Structure formats: C-alpha cells, structure tokens
C-alpha cells in the first residue's frame, strides 16, 4: 500500500518509527517531515510504501528514494528548486547508493532550509545534540 490514504500525522509517526535507531534514515525522514511540503503531495506520497511489521504488527512506512527521484526527474513531482534540493539531500541521506552534488543543491536553499539540512546532517552522524534538536 502507498502512503496516500494515511493521514499526515500518522504517516509522520510511521516513517519515524520505521527509521528509529538508524541515524541516516531518521535524518532523511526527519528532513522530509520538517520541510513540511512533501507529505502533503500525493505525487510524493505514492513513493511511500506502508504496511505492518511481521514481528510486532506495528504500522510501518518507508520512502522509496529512487521512486521519489524518478518522479522528480520525469516531471511527475514538480518542485521548486529549493524543494528539489531538499529531496535530493534527503534521498542521499536515506540511501547510501544515491549521490548528491552539494555544490549544485546548496545554493538553492534559504536560511531556514540550510538549517534543516544542517540539522539532518548532524542527526545522520548519530549526534543527538546541537542543531539536530531543531529537526522535527
């Protein structure tokens, strides 16, 4: 099932619960959530797979980073340049096989979004202190 039918607050919890304990995944999901744009877009939510844990029965959700970038690149997920930058950085944090050219994306970010990215990078490094506390 994709994430389009799940209320945003519930989807937020499921994404964070699924990523819990994996700093880079938590940072990637947290960046998308904190940005406040993507979880309100059906085109993005279709890249989210939702289900339940076979061990605990808890609801879970994961972002298909390749699918999200493919939607972006094929025009199915139109975004402003700053939104594209956030998505590309989050995808790179969430999937180590996805590279990001920081020199190309950072110039598209305003002060607020630079703060979100900085917090995500700190969180991905496994630090629970400093700017990461502003994330989420």
Where are these regions (language model features)?
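Extended, charge-biased low-complexity segments
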Residues: 1-78, 96-136
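Long, hydrophobic alpha/beta structural blocks
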Residues: 83-86
């Amino acid at each position: 099932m994709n994430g389009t039918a799940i209320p945003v607050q519930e989807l937020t919890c499921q994404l964070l619960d699924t990523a819990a304990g994996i700093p880079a995944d938590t940072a990637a999901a947290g960046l998308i959530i904190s940005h406040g744009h993507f979880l309100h877009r059906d085109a993005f939510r279709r890249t989210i797979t939702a289900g339940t844990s076979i061990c605990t029965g808890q609801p879970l959700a994961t972002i298909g980073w390749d699918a999200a970038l493919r939607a972006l690149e094929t025009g199915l997920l139109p975004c402003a340049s700053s939104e594209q930058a956030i998505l590309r950085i989050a995808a790179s944090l969430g999937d180590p096989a996805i590279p990001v050219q920081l020199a190309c994306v950072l110039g598209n970010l305003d002060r607020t979004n630079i703060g979100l990215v900085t917090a995500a990078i700190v969180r991905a490094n496994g630090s629970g202190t400093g700017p990461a506390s502003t994330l989420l």
